[in-house]
Curated annotation (Swiss-Prot):
GO biological process, any: regulation of DNA-templated transcription
Subcellular location: Cytoplasm
Keywords assigned by UniProt, alphabetized: Cytoplasm, DNA-binding, Transcription, Transcription regulation
Protein family membership: Belongs to the TACO1 family.
PANTHER family: TRANSCRIPTIONAL REGULATORY PROTEIN YEBC-RELATED, TRANSLATIONAL ACTIVATOR OF CYTOCHROME C OXIDASE 1
UniProt xrefs under InterPro entries: Integrase-like_N, TACO1_YebC-like_2nd/3rd_dom, TACO1_YebC_N, Transcrip_reg_TACO1-like, Transcrip_reg_TACO1-like_dom3, YebC-like
Protein name: Probable transcriptional regulatory protein TM_0466
């Protein structure tokens, strides 16, 4: 069985490979602008900005684009004033959905989201309706083929402060408290591991979906991810691996 994390990884790979690459840049630029505005333009003293810049570099964003986004955030260059807004709701099948948006027009974003929820048979809910279902955690991912000694990896991660290690699937996931993410990531990199790290929201419980509900959920999540204002989408669905791959193949086709 797989859930939101597998869908997110597949979606990211497809966006990186096709014309939607520009959408990744759009979202990352907004993230950098807001991070620089709230915590300053120095990546050494602003962890959120450092994380956003690292993600941008991983996506091969040109250096000048990154620097320009930082200057927009600090006010050195004129830029749009984005606000961070959280939206919550339910997708088909009772799946909880937690959305983080960066927008310059909250009314427009709320209207567009309400339209999508209604279109796919879900419902936009009040603040706090589903946030209790999710826990904020740091997640470090390492491709299985990059790990020669799993026991060594586990020991380094645990000694650095990791809470849990999930090695049943690829990539291997190391779970940390958000405040320990940077330390665990640094220790792994010092040991020679290539890692990807992010702060995310992990569901405490999941909802299994199949058939039409499964198709509607994936179609709905794809539509949410395609919105420029939406930075991150989290959900608590669970479905059969093969069914997910078949549905995504049809949707992408």
């Amino acid at each position: 069985m797989s859930g939101h994390n597998k869908w997110a990884n597949i979606k990211h790979r497809k966006m990186a490979q096709d014309a939607k690459k520009s959408k990744i840049f759009t979202k990352l630029i907004r993230e950098i602008i807001v991070a620089a505005r709230e915590g300053g333009g120095n990546i050494e003293t602003n962890p959120r900005l450092r994380a956003a810049v690292e993600r941008a570099r991983a996506e091969n964003m040109p250096k000048e684009n990154i620097e320009r986004a930082i200057k927009r955030g600090t006010g050195e260059l004129e830029g749009v004033d984005y606000q961070e807004v959280i939206y919550e709701g339910y997708a088909p099948g009772g799946v909880a959905v937690y959305i983080r948006a960066l927008t310059d027009n909250k009314n427009r974003t709320a209207q567009e989201l309400r339209h999508l929820f209604n279109k796919y048979g879900g419902s936009l809910a009040e603040s706090g309706s589903v946030s209790w279902i999710f826990e904020r955690k740091g997640v470090i991912e390492i491709s299985r083929d990059k790990v020669k000694d799993l026991e060594e990896l586990m020991m380094i991660a645990i000694d650095a402060g990791a809470e849990d290690i999930k090695d049943a699937e690829d990539p291997i996931q190391i779970i940390t408290a958000p405040e320990n993410l940077s330390e665990v990531k640094s220790k792994l990199e010092e040991a020679g591991y290539e890692v990807e790290a992010k702060v995310t929201f992990i569901p405490k419980n999941t909802v299994k979906v199949t058939g039409k509900d499964a198709e509607k959920v994936l179609e709905f999540l794809n539509a949410l991810e395609d919105m420029d204002d939406v930075q991150e989408v989290y959900s608590n669905f669970e479905m059969d691996d093969k069914e997910m791959e078949e549905i995504l193949s049809r949707l992408e086709g």
